[in-house]
Amino acid sequence: MEREKVVLAYSGGLDTSVAIKWLMQKYSLDVITLTVDIGQGIDLNEIKNKAENLGVEKAYVLDLREEFIKDYIIPAIKSNAMYERVYPLATALSRPLIAKYLVKVAKENGAKYVAHGCTGKGNDQVRIDLGVKALAPDLEIIAPVREWNFSREEEIEYAIENNIPIPVSRKNPYSIDENLWGRSIEGGILEDPWQEPPEDIYLWTKLENKEPSYIEITFEKGIPVKLNGVEKDLVGLIEELNKIAGSYGIGRIDHIENRLVGIKSREIYEAPAALVIIKAHEALEDLVLPRELAHFKRMLEDKYAELVYYGLWFDPFREALQAFMDKTQERVTGKVKIKLIPWSFSIVGRDSPYSLYDHSLATYDKGSTFSTESAVGFIKLFGLQNYLYALKGGKNA
């Protein structure tokens, strides 16, 4: 009798490596692995070979970097998406894409199940489960880590007993997730919010340059298209900016985060390009968007980031907000100058053909065209409701 199939989102790390053997032993399933390239910067063929050596039926490796950029990172840039105004959502943005291809590979192979290595405490379980169910309600989801309740130590023991090669040891107990948009590090000493993260956990943000320098990012309709005047595809631009900003130690985030499941967690991120691009994009929007639109957009950005963080990428609310965000970007074209110094950066210049900044109106020097005489009438009308309220006794009525 032919065994049922399961498609496992496979990273090559501890959880999913253990999950391959566990799914075979516990559920008697034929395992198909799916590994996606979203800019991890590692040899994915090695991961494919590892999966095959563990006895999987098929091992898929898909290069999804362009799709990740086009359909997930660009919408996030347009929305200045930062959960709790701190975290640029690198991991959260990748999960709906992974869910999409879990469904696709499952359908192609007639699999009844999909599986992932998310824990029962984290946000990723929600993101992938909701993504899969939004696209294929008929598929069943197995989350081995939620079921087996292994501690990190017990997982390592299981791997050793089953001859599973893993990149984690008792001396290096970190769980790392990485893509083009950012890198996250969890576990070990980092779980103590009082302890300073050891320097050796950082890979992208090491202080190598101490002399200040300037970079320039050019945007077209909200999308970065040039770095220092040189046109680049966004994959290349992000990769180069990660290196440039990261060499100043820029991009480290140490954050107490409110997880969707109700707990607080200590999260360490590296996101040099993401932080610089979003701040530059905000600065350009400040120059070209009318005040009311700019203010309202900032409010919606927080909700947008929450929806992405919560795993509601395919929700109609997120899609409706995206339509609004896209509309706001029609004039977000121009360039932004950024100064880089050790451990920090600042916006020091911005220019756009759609700039609403008018020097002749804004200047306090001689020659200003602003009509100060009009201010008296404006103030009277603007404050008319408060004036009438005060006449009727105001707060003392």
UniProtKB/Swiss-Prot annotation:
Record's subunit section: Homotetramer.
Q: Which gene encodes it?
A: argG
Q: Any idea which positions bind L-aspartate?
A: 119, 123-124
Give a Gene Ontology cellular component term annotated to this protein: cytoplasm
Please give the superkingdom of this protein's source: Bacteria
Q: Which UniProt keywords apply?
A: Amino-acid biosynthesis, Arginine biosynthesis, ATP-binding, Cytoplasm, Ligase, Nucleotide-binding
What's a single GO MF annotation on this record? ATP binding
What residues bind ATP, as annotated?
A: 9-17, 117
Task: Describe the family membership recorded for this protein in Swiss-Prot or TrEMBL.
Answer: Belongs to the argininosuccinate synthase family. Type 1 subfamily.
**First-tier enzyme category under EC:** ligase
Instruction: Identify the metabolic or biological route this protein is part of.
Output: Amino-acid biosynthesis; L-arginine biosynthesis; L-arginine from L-ornithine and carbamoyl phosphate: step 2/3
Q: What is its main location?
A: cytoplasm
Name the UniProt record assigns to this protein: Argininosuccinate synthase
As recorded in UniProt, its EC number(s) are 6.3.4.5
**What reaction does this catalyse?**
L-citrulline + L-aspartate + ATP = 2-(N(omega)-L-arginino)succinate + AMP + diphosphate + H(+)
Keyword Ligase tagged: yes
Is the Cell division keyword given for this protein?
no
What CDD domains does this protein map onto?
ASS
For the biological process aspect of GO, one term held by this record is:
L-arginine biosynthetic process
PANTHER family (UniProt xref): ARGININOSUCCINATE SYNTHASE
Q: Where in the cell is it found?
A: Cytoplasm
